[in-house]
């Protein structure tokens, strides 16, 4: 910079612009790069970083171009930042940068020549501030000015005179007015000189912050240069007029512009955050409530402790009730009134009410008690786990009743005693008559165990959880146990509840010392603990498990499942009922009793699922025969197909074979004789 060549006109402009025009002959020695005596004016004394202190205590002035370059950089940065924020419609930040630039220009206006050179730039900056203030005017105020046919200006105006003494005696302005009286220009210059000697942050940091405007981030203003309307003593008359418009304070980091009437303006100053300060978290909560049409006031987000300490709070201090770290689980000691769902959800997993989805929030609201508090079992669980378990609730009627199940009279009677009757008459089924809390349905596959669970969901007016192994397992270590806790916690909140676990042997198989993963063992242990814990006598929760491998169940799980019902293969009468019921639904039943007896004898050892597949294959016989006659399937009608006959079932028996072996039936019968609940 020192070696560059400039013209005389440029040199004269730079000296007059930055306050060097009053030095006289001294400037020639400075421009020539020679040593000179220290600056005569305290306002033009360079910062400490530009002074080279020698051992003898003498000081050497730096190259004047460096200081000019720093001033130009600051001017361009602030001016560019204000223009950039105006383009982005960020009027609040543009206003702050414009005011900082205005103060910077005023600090360099020492002589009349300086004011003449700086005047055009100052008027341009003032116009940018006016544009920012017009952008900050709320829609309601703008409409009011349009109706009054008046240009937007100061909200508080007075056509007549005002009493200065009354203002001095005011609670808010008396102190500042009394302090400002008697202060001359000399005192202000001395104070400015003192401020110049205070070490400040390097200007490179401010330049780095302002360069972030090329992206989406916004540079934060310097805290040492922020001043409010009340304590700004050195502002010019034009600055006072600008700051008075619409009551926006300039001592805020990011002032929150909200629509407020003149009547409640005082209430906002007293109850809201002091000096208009709004933290990022509270600002986000206010925006979310405004989008959802909430009528809760922004001041309710702050706890009483934070309101009490807000007056002495700086930018580096922390207020009570706010999170102190990333995903912190800090619980504020003060309990707020009103809707407690958001406060409770903030305790779960460190998430606030704004971080939850609508489905998760709805799920938590359904589980809250009359006081708006979550039960003790669910407070330490993450909301997503609670929602995951709640999604397993069967909210649709499976349209299965006891009449749709063939045979199994003993199983129907036991389930009615354990589920249906206690729900209808809880006053009778208590004490010694209280039903068991565990039911096991075991038997060969395809015999109707899952169908019994669906019938329970249709007959019992209770919350029905349809659980499988995938519902309680996760790839994350420790999450399976939390899902088990969430399952029984939600069931306790939604009681009367029925938990149906299909293929329960996959979850509660026998625990082994070798060859078993640690996470699987912890999951079984947690499940057994919850099964033992919810059996308190007063809770209406029933656990039903269905399995094809009862011999692989853990002994502790077998003890907790007090009723163990064997679901055998359907009898001859049950098989005939299945055939008749399925064919009558489609209007295809024309078989005689002799044909039914023959079919039942030929289907010995078939399960209920095998019988259903047999009927489906038999009904395909008339269709295959019609297609063999050359009828196009696109033109085929029901009249072209004959009814189902015995021969169709005999042909289907060649395609559909029984799925259960006789050896497996022996295992089920032996286990039933040893551990099952036998029929009377």
Swiss-Prot record:
<dbReference type="Pfam" id="PF24347">
    <property type="entry name" value="FIGL1_N"/>
</dbReference>
<dbReference type="InterPro" id="IPR050304">
    <property type="entry name" value="MT-severing_AAA_ATPase"/>
</dbReference>
<feature type="region of interest" description="Disordered">
    <location>
        <begin position="214"/>
        <end position="234"/>
    </location>
</feature>
<dbReference type="Pfam" id="PF09336">
    <property type="entry name" value="Vps4_C"/>
</dbReference>
<dbReference type="GO" id="GO:0006281">
    <property type="term" value="P:DNA repair"/>
</dbReference>
<keyword id="KW-0234">DNA repair</keyword>
<feature type="compositionally biased region" description="Polar residues">
    <location>
        <begin position="336"/>
        <end position="346"/>
    </location>
</feature>
<comment type="similarity">
    <text>Belongs to the AAA ATPase family.</text>
</comment>
<keyword id="KW-0067">ATP-binding</keyword>
<keyword id="KW-0539">Nucleus</keyword>
<keyword id="KW-0378">Hydrolase</keyword>
<dbReference type="InterPro" id="IPR003593">
    <property type="entry name" value="AAA+_ATPase"/>
</dbReference>
<feature type="region of interest" description="Disordered">
    <location>
        <begin position="288"/>
        <end position="352"/>
    </location>
</feature>
<dbReference type="GO" id="GO:0045128">
    <property type="term" value="P:negative regulation of reciprocal meiotic recombination"/>
</dbReference>
<dbReference type="GO" id="GO:0005524">
    <property type="term" value="F:ATP binding"/>
</dbReference>
<dbReference type="InterPro" id="IPR041569">
    <property type="entry name" value="AAA_lid_3"/>
</dbReference>
<feature type="binding site">
    <location>
        <begin position="446"/>
        <end position="451"/>
    </location>
    <ligand>
        <name>ATP</name>
    </ligand>
</feature>
<feature type="region of interest" description="Disordered">
    <location>
        <begin position="250"/>
        <end position="275"/>
    </location>
</feature>
<dbReference type="InterPro" id="IPR003959">
    <property type="entry name" value="ATPase_AAA_core"/>
</dbReference>
<dbReference type="GO" id="GO:0005634">
    <property type="term" value="C:nucleus"/>
</dbReference>
<protein>
    <recommendedName>
        <fullName>ATPase family AAA domain-containing protein FIGL1</fullName>
        <ecNumber>3.6.4.-</ecNumber>
    </recommendedName>
</protein>
<dbReference type="Pfam" id="PF17862">
    <property type="entry name" value="AAA_lid_3"/>
</dbReference>
<feature type="binding site">
    <location>
        <position position="406"/>
    </location>
    <ligand>
        <name>ATP</name>
    </ligand>
</feature>
<dbReference type="GO" id="GO:0016887">
    <property type="term" value="F:ATP hydrolysis activity"/>
</dbReference>
<feature type="compositionally biased region" description="Gly residues">
    <location>
        <begin position="313"/>
        <end position="323"/>
    </location>
</feature>
<comment type="function">
    <text>Involved in DNA double-strand break (DBS) repair via homologous recombination (HR). Limits class II meiotic crossover (CO) formation by regulating the invasion step of meiotic HR. May counteract DMC1 and RAD51-mediated inter-homolog strand invasion to limit CO formation. Functions independently of FANCM.</text>
</comment>
<dbReference type="InterPro" id="IPR056224">
    <property type="entry name" value="FIGL1_N"/>
</dbReference>
<keyword id="KW-0547">Nucleotide-binding</keyword>
<keyword id="KW-0227">DNA damage</keyword>
<keyword id="KW-0233">DNA recombination</keyword>
<feature type="compositionally biased region" description="Polar residues">
    <location>
        <begin position="295"/>
        <end position="308"/>
    </location>
</feature>
<dbReference type="Pfam" id="PF00004">
    <property type="entry name" value="AAA"/>
</dbReference>
<dbReference type="InterPro" id="IPR027417">
    <property type="entry name" value="P-loop_NTPase"/>
</dbReference>
<dbReference type="GO" id="GO:0006310">
    <property type="term" value="P:DNA recombination"/>
</dbReference>
<dbReference type="InterPro" id="IPR015415">
    <property type="entry name" value="Spast_Vps4_C"/>
</dbReference>
<dbReference type="InterPro" id="IPR003960">
    <property type="entry name" value="ATPase_AAA_CS"/>
</dbReference>
